[in-house]
Amino acid sequence: MAQIEQFRRRFKREVVYQSHCVHSNIVPIYLCDLFAENPWFIMDKAECDLEHEITNNLLTTDQKISIVKMVLDGVAHIHAKGYLHRDIKPFNVLRFSDGTYKVSDFGLVKDTNPEGDTTKLTEIGTRMGSTRYMAPEILYNAEYSVKTDVYAVGRLIEDLNLDDKKIKPIIAKCTRMDKDDRYQTIDDVAFDFVHSFLRSES
């Protein structure tokens, strides 16, 4: 029974946090019932996830650049709401029929707002997220932060295998071993990413 109750609480938090993040690059929640015997929510049906497209080499360079911009916009909005996603990876980026890519899966989101829900639903010492996208400090039980999401975004950009020398320094700065050497915010990542292409076009 305790496990069922924990699942219900986690599910509720996931839906509430995701519904708070209304943005064109975040999967929207249209309707939900969090108090039903079997809680549920309704969202758009995605065509596929980014991991599938990367694995099957389905993306052009222009598409990859556009996807990075959309992911950065979505994650920046999550952070602006005072949340940490904590599970950014290609599998959690979904493509929809209009060609838009949206960040999904708020199951591990943490609310950092002072008045936020501080209930711990995961045992102390349990590491969350996927190992490849997990910042090094998390392996030593450090606190999650904006910079742990920055690290994960850097790994996601790396996965897209953009054959462009301008991108490598951005990936390197996102994924520094020491978090203090990484970008301070997702907006900083976006600024360098966008301007690296503007400089090349001028």
Locate each region found by the language model:
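AlphaC helix of the eukaryotic protein kinase fold
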Residues: 3-20
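AlphaC helix of the protein kinase catalytic domain
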Residues: 50-60
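Activation segment signature within eukaryotic-like protein kinase domains
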Residues: 67-68
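Short beta-strand micro-motifs within the conserved protein kinase catalytic domain, predominantly
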Residues: 28-39
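Conserved catalytic-loop aspartate of Hanks-type protein kinases
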Residues: 149
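Conserved activation segment of eukaryotic-like protein kinases, specifically the C-terminal portion
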Residues: 121-137
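Catalytic-loop of the protein kinase fold
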Residues: 79-95
